[in-house]
C-alpha cells in the first residue's frame, strides 16, 4: 500500500503541474517562464486540513488526494525524501503568518510542524511595511537571496488574517560539467525565420535521449551530481513547434510515456545558458484551476485559527532558475533505432536547443520546477 500512496503525490503533482503550467503559459504567451507547481501543493494541502465542507472537497480534488490521512502520510515522507536527496542543495520552506490577535488551532500547529515542517508566526499586519519586510527577509534567507520582495506591503492590512508563504530553492552541479571555453554566441530561432544570438553551451557526452511522436519532440536528460535529480529538456522538432508542444503537454501522461522510451547514447548537446524569473498571481491561476472557495468570504477554513473562519486574501509565487556550465540554480513512445554500419564511425545524435523549448527539473522522480525558454 505504501507505493500506492507515494503515487498519489507523484500523480497529484504531475496533474497539478500540467494544469498550472498551461495557465502560466496562457498568461505569458511567447515568453520564458519558470514555475514550481510542487511548492504550491504543501500550502494547499495545509489549507485542506484546516477546512471543511465544499472548500475541503475542492482542495482535495485540486491536489489529487483521496483524504486527509493521505495528505498527512505523503507530505511527511516526501519532505523527508527530498531533504535527503544526494549531491544537490534543495531547500523547501513553508511558513504561516497569522494576524496578531489570532491563535493557531493546536492540532493545526502540530500538523504544520510535523507534516509540513512549517513554522507559524504571529505578525501585526496593520504595520504593513514592517510585516512585509519581515516576511520578505524570511523568504530571501530561505532561497539563497534569489527571491526578493515576494509580498507587497500594499497587499497587507489590518484586515489580513493569514499569509501562507512557500519557498523552494534548488542548486545542483551537473554530473559532468560543460567546458566554458566551448560556450559561444550562436543563432537561436525566436520564431520560424527570426534569430537572435544566445550564449550556447556545448558538450559531447552520454545522455539519456529519446524521441516522441506524440510530442513531436526530442528529449534529453541531463543529470546532476548524486544522480537523484536531473533537467529534462523537451525540444520541438519544428523550430516554431513550441505552442503545439505546450498543447500536447496538457496531458501529463505524454511526458511520462516519452521518458519511458529514453535510452543512453552519445549526444552532441547544445544548450543555451539562461536565467528566468517569473512572478505568478496564484489567486488568478488557481481560480482557473477550479480552486475558488478558499478566496471567497464564505470559505470554510475553520481549523487554522481558534474560533475564527478565514479566507485567503493573497497568493503569489515567485520562481527563479539559472542554468549554466556548472549546473543549475533554481528557486521554483517512439523508439529510435540506430543501425551501425560496419567500419563506419557512428555519428553521435545531435540535440541542438536552438529554438524555444520546455524544461522539467526533477528531484527523486518528482517535477520540482518546469518552464519554457523563449527569449
From Swiss-Prot:
Gene3D superfamilies, per database record: Alpha-1-antitrypsin, domain 1 (2.30.39.10), Antithrombin, subunit I, domain 2 (3.30.497.10)
GO molecular function, one term: serine-type endopeptidase inhibitor activity
A GO cellular component entry from the record: extracellular space
Protein's cellular compartments: Secreted
Annotated CDD domains: serpin1K-like
First-listed, main subcellular location of the protein, grouped into a coarse class: secreted
InterPro entries documented for this protein: Serpin_CS, Serpin_dom, Serpin_fam, Serpin_sf, Serpin_sf_1, Serpin_sf_2
Reported tissue expression: Hemolymph.
A Pfam family assignment: Serpin
Domain of life: Eukaryota
Secreted found in the keyword field: yes
UniProt keyword list: Protease inhibitor, Secreted, Serine protease inhibitor
Family as reported in the entry's similarity comment: Belongs to the serpin family.
Entry domain remark: The reactive center loop (RCL) extends out from the body of the protein and directs binding to the target protease. The protease cleaves the serpin at the reactive site within the RCL, establishing a covalent linkage between the serpin reactive site and the active site of the protease. The resulting inactive serpin-protease complex is highly stable.
Other remarks on this protein: The N-terminal section (1-336) is identical to the N-terminal section of the silk moth antitrypsin I (17-352).
Name of this protein: Antichymotrypsin-2
Organism: Bombyx mori (Silk moth)
Amino acid at each position: 500500500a505504501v507505493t500506492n500512496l507515494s503515487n498519489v503525490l507523484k500523480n497529484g503533482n504531475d496533474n497539478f503541474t500540467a494544469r498550472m503550467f498551461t495557465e502560466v503559459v496562457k498568461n505569458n504567451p511567447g515568453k520564458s517562464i519558470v514555475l514550481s507547481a510542487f511548492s504550491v501543493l504543501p500550502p494547499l494541502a495545509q489549507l485542506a486540513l484546516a477546512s471543511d465542507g465544499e472548500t475541503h472537497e475542492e482542495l482535495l480534488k485540486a491536489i489529487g488526494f483521496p483524504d486527509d490521512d493521505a495528505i498527512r502520510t505523503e507530505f511527511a515522507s516526501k519532505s523527508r525524501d527530498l531533504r535527503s536527496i544526494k549531491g544537490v542543495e534543495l531547500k523547501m520552506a513553508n511558513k504561516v503568518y497569522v494576524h496578531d490577535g489570532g491563535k493557531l488551532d493546536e492540532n493545526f500547529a502540530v500538523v504544520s510542524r510535523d507534516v509540513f515542517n512549517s513554522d507559524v508566526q504571529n505578525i501585526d499586519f496593520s504595520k504593513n511595511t514592517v510585516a512585509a519586510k519581515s516576511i520578505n527577509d524570511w523568504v530571501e534567507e530561505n532561497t539563497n537571496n534569489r527571491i526578493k520582495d515576494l509580498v507587497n506591503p500594499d497587499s497587507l492590512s489590518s484586515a489580513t488574517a493569514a499569509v501562507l508563504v512557500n519557498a523552494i530553492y534548488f542548486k545542483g552541479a551537473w554530473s559532468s560539467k560543460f567546458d566554458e571555453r566551448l560556450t559561444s554566441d550562436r543563432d537561436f530561432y525566436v520564431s520560424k525565420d527570426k534569430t537572435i544570438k544566445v550564449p550556447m553551451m556545448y558538450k559531447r557526452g552520454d545522455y539519456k535521449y529519446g524521441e516522441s511522436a506524440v510530442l513531436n519532440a526530442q528529449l534529453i536528460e541531463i543529470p546532476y551530481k548524486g544522480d537523484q535529480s536531473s533537467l529534462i529538456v523537451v525540444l520541438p522538432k519544428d523550430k516554431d513547434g513550441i505552442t503545439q508542444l505546450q498543447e500536447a503537454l496538457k496531458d501529463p501522461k505524454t511526458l511520462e510515456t516519452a521518458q519511458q522510451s529514453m535510452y543512453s547514447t552519445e549526444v552532441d548537446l547544445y544548450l543555451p545558458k539562461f536565467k528566468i524569473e517569473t512572478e505568478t498571481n496564484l489567486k488568478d491561476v488557481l481560480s482557473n484551476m477550479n480552486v475558488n472557495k478558499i478566496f471567497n468570504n464564505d470559505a470554510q477554513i475553520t481549523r487554522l485559527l481558534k474560533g475564527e473562519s478565514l479566507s485567503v486574501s493573497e497568493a503569489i509565487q515567485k520562481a527563479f532558475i539559472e542554468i549554466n556550465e556548472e549546473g543549475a540554480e533554481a528557486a521554483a513512445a517512439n523508439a529510435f533505432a540506430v543501425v551501425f554500419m560496419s567500419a563506419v564511425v557512428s555519428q553521435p545524435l545531435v540535440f541542438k536547443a536552438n529554438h524555444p523549448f520546455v524544461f522539467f527539473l526533477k528531484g527523486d522522480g518528482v517535477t520540482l520546477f518546469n518552464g519554457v525558454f523563449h527569449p
